[in-house]
Amino acid sequence: MPARADEASDRNSARLTGRVVYLAEALQKLHGVKTVDEARQNTLALQTDDDQLIPIVEDVRGRAFRRDDRLRKMRVELLVRRYEGVPAVQIIRVFELTDEGRFELDYWCDICAIAMFELKACDCCQGPIELRRRPAADDR
């Protein structure tokens, strides 16, 4: 029986680097593959540093890249979970990679002091939240 998401072990995880893009736009740029207009922004994918396109499961962590275009402009390292027989990956953690270093990304509510994984109103107070960028230990 395949492992459920909450049962996945470290052997099912990987670290991938690149930029998150819309799959249809990347297929057009990299390979000249044209999709229908309505597919243009349907699927998010990680375009790796060597131009592989890896689809992203759009749960709350994946959806963050749709809701906040700042994330799609960043070079990122994604800690992902892979499932046997599935080409898409599920995001576990997000890191920004810059010349200054590696930074873990999430969203933060200063009022409630809670972290969230996508740009939206705070789950608790319904107030605004901010993109939080914290230096990350090099635990790779």
Features from the language model and the residues they span:
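Cys/His-clustered metal-coordination modules, chiefly Zn-binding fingers
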Residues: 90-140
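Carbohydrate-interacting regions of secretory-pathway proteins
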Residues: 60-61, 70, 88-95
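Extracytoplasmic
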Residues: 15, 41, 71-75, 104, ...
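Boundary at the C-terminal end of the N-terminal hydrophobic targeting segment
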Residues: 2-10
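OB-fold (S1/OB) nucleic-acid-binding surfaces
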Residues: 32-57
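Short nucleic-acid-contacting surface segments enriched for D/E, G, S/T with interspersed K/R
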Residues: 60-78
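Structural detector for short beta-strands of small beta-barrel domains
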Residues: 9-40, 80
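Short, charged beta-turn/beta-strand-edge "cap" motif at the junction between a beta-strand
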Residues: 81-87
